[in-house]
C-alpha cells in the first residue's frame, strides 16, 4: 500500500488516542495530518489540507446524525476522499444504511476486531462496502430473516387452493 494522508475525527479522547496508536503502529503508510474531536474542528482542518482518508466516528458529540451529515457534505465537496466510519453504534442499523447512502466507503465497529491494515488498504484501493466481522454477521442475520420471511410468504401463496366460490368470482370478473 502506498503512503496516504488521514484525518481522524473522534470525540472521545481515549478512543482518539487509541485510534492514533493503531495507525502509528499497524498502518505505517498513513500520515496523520490532523485530528478533530468535533465537526467544528474538522472543517478548518480540511481547509488546510485535503486528506486521502477520513476516519470518522459516527456519533460525534452524542448525536448520530452529525457523522452522517459530515460524511454527506465531505463526499459532496470532495468525492475523491475515502471515508471509513469507525463507530460504536452497534444496534442502529438504519444509521449504517444512512451513512453508506451518504457516501461512506465502509463501516468498522469498535466492538470485535478493531481497525486493521487490511480494512484500510481495501478502502484506499477503492473497494466499497468494507465491513468488519460484527457488521457482516448482522448483515447476514438480516438477510437470512428477509429470505425466510419471503419464502414463508411464497409458501402461503402456493398453498392457497381455489374453491368453487373463487372460481365463480373470477369468471364473473372476466366477463
Give the label of every model feature segment.
Residues 1-7, 14, 157-158:
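Non-catalytic signal-transmission and effector/linker regions of two-component phosphorelay proteins
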Residues 12-39:
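Two-component/phosphorelay signaling modules centered on CheY-like receiver
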Residues 47-49, 73-81, 102:
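Conserved phosphotransfer cores of two-component systems
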Residues 54-74:
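Conserved phosphotransfer microenvironments
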Residues 100, 106, 111-157:
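Short, flexible helix-to-coil linker/hinge segments that flank and couple to helix-turn-helix
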Residues 150-175:
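Helix-turn-helix DNA-binding segment
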